[in-house]
Amino acid sequence: MKVLLLEDVKNLGKAGEVCEVKDGYGNNFLIANKKAKLATNEVINKYKAEAKKKAEKEALEKAQKLQMVETLQTITLTIHKKVGANGSLFGAITKEEITERLKEQHASLNLDKKDIELKHPIKSTGIYEIEVKLGSGVVGAFKIDVVAE
């Protein structure tokens, strides 16, 4: 019996492969547990079409993320905060505050606070480089300029 694996199966194969298995193993374990489907031409073609569509969607998303990184690299975000006598801020600048200011000044960029990586808390004025991880291995950075009010 030939089956198309829907997920990786130990000692048999990886998802998307067509494997020859015994009838009992195929029907009673693989197909019953939705780990495989009976490998007909229709099922194989449908699986290949879905895989192709998924790959195209992932490529489009990655291209959009790369475009966002290029845009981010040109940005210098300015944040005005109250400062004490010694030049330190009252409180720290948070990821949430950075995303809010980014949305205010650059509405086209839609970043979530979980995408921003702060290496250390920002507690004084100056220019800082903020790292952004957008997923799919796409990493970028932009600068923020913290100035006294």
Swiss-Prot record:
GO terms for cellular component: ribonucleoprotein complex; ribosome. Signal peptide: none annotated. Binds to the 23S rRNA. Keywords: Ribonucleoprotein, Ribosomal protein, RNA-binding, rRNA-binding. It comes from Helicobacter pylori (strain HPAG1). The lineage of its organism: Bacteria, Pseudomonadati, Campylobacterota, Epsilonproteobacteria, Campylobacterales. One of its GO terms (biological process) is translation. PANTHER family: 50S RIBOSOMAL PROTEIN L9 (PTHR21368). SUPFAM superfamilies: L9 N-domain-like, Ribosomal protein L9 C-domain. The keyword Transcription does not apply. It comes from the Bacteria. HAMAP family: Ribosomal_bL9. This is Large ribosomal subunit protein bL9. GO terms for molecular function: rRNA binding; structural constituent of ribosome. Belongs to the bacterial ribosomal protein bL9 family.
